[in-house]
């Protein structure tokens, strides 16, 4: 199993592009398009959900990661469905890149934190003998 230091360094590297595009997206909201109070509340909750997952990923806490992911899914759907229709192309591009890099971080975090124990105990105990 990789050391926690190595895992943390890899996670930080994979997180960096998401942080950059999320910051650019947030900055965009202070310029060309200013969201209303309801959208800002959804964004605040979505950001808190992302922080919950990210902290859980660095702690390798599966319960915290899953709670963060469920919250991201719920508030992400609300954000996209109700507030992100007919966005300017520049903002759509920022969202697409932020989503892609968040997905990459989620995949890497779950793989590094939870896949090695499954691989080292093959076959899994739940499989037929």
Model-derived features with residue positions:
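Core segments of transmembrane alpha-helices
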Residues: 42-55, 98-106
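Interfacial loop at the N-terminal end of multi-pass membrane proteins
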Residues: 26-48
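N-terminal signal-anchor/start-transfer transmembrane helix
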Residues: 9-29
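Hydrophobic alpha-helical membrane segments
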Residues: 67-81, 98-107
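C-terminal ends of transmembrane helices
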Residues: 22-34, 77-89
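Non-cytosolic membrane-interface motifs at loop->transmembrane helix junctions
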Residues: 35-39, 88-97
């Amino acid at each position: 199993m990789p050391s926690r230091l190595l895992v943390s360094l890899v996670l930080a590297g994979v997180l960096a592009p998401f942080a950059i595009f999320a910051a650019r997206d947030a900055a965009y909201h202070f310029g060309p398009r200013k969201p209303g109070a309801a959208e800002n509340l959804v964004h605040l909750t979505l950001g808190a959900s992302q922080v919950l997952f990210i902290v859980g990923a660095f702690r390798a806490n599966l319960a915290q990661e899953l709670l963060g992911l469920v919250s991201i899914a719920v508030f992400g759907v609300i954000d996209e469905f109700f507030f992100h229709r007919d966005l300017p192309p520049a903002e759509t591009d920022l969202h697409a890149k932020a989503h892609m890099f968040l997905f990459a971080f989620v995949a890497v975090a779950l793989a590094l934190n939870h896949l090695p124990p499954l691989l080292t105990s093959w076959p899994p105990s739940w499989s037929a003998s």
